[in-house]
Amino acid sequence: MDILYIIWFDVLPILVFLGGGWFLAGKFKIEVKTYEIVITRVVLPFFVFFSLYQVPLAASDFLLLPAALLLTALLFVLSSLLSKGLSQEPSLRQAICGMASCPNVCYLGGVLTYLTFSHLPFASAGEAAELPKALALLSLLMTLSHLLLRTVGHAIVSRESSSLSSLLLRALTTPVLYGALLAFAAQHFDIPLKGTFLYPVLHHFTGAFMVLTAVTTGVMIRRSHCFTVSKDILLPALVKLLVSPLLALGLLAIFPSMDDLAKEILLLFAAIPCAMDFSMVGTTSAQKSIFQRSLMTQMSLSILTLPLVIFLCRLFFPASM
């Protein structure tokens, strides 16, 4: 019965939002780059700030960061070996490696987490007690994901040499980083936001973030047009959607002090399809084609894999029971 709840409350709403983006892209001239800028520079930082501000995290919760870094490193090694066997073209190998290893939960991660922890089987009797902390934990991974995409992802995919100073500059010019730092500062100095005009505005950013990111992803899918699936696309997608969650399960044995909710978030983080922001890594046209085809393949396959991973979260780590 749980798997039916997961499909009905978690997967189908995402498909509806993606379909809305698909429909709007066919009826109106929508500039995807503008929406990406709004998301990454405005909506996402405010969402991360508000999510982290609402729930003070324990020291053990920050174990998510080294766990996610280890997972990314393992995926990078695995995808590097895989890419060498799939293509002899350096730029295509870089693209394959980037799509299989670089995390980017900033688009669908928030939507999936919100839907998962606000409905059955993770919430009951109209109460979603775990939702605020789940969004806070995901915001940690969103911040890390965005930083990795702008630094490590850029270094992997870009054919230009990247110095340490240039990568550091890219990290320091990441807006979501400052959203997280401001949230921790507001908590540390006990700055109250409730009762001010800012609180309802920040609260509404959660809903805006969910709708805008899902619809924008639908627009991106519409712009990808038709595509063919080949082994250089399918195998990296399977690494991201199937091997990555299995690696995450194995890594959790190294972090026994992590609570069940954090383990669930890490497992979701590992299973979410990559929705790489092309504009942030400056890809060539050949690489962009690989990215678009990989995005479509991962999104299509994730309709089958995500319900299974969410069910495993419930089975192995029953934080909300």
Where do the PLM segments sit?
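Alpha-helical transmembrane segments of multi-pass small-molecule/ion transporters
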Residues: 1-321
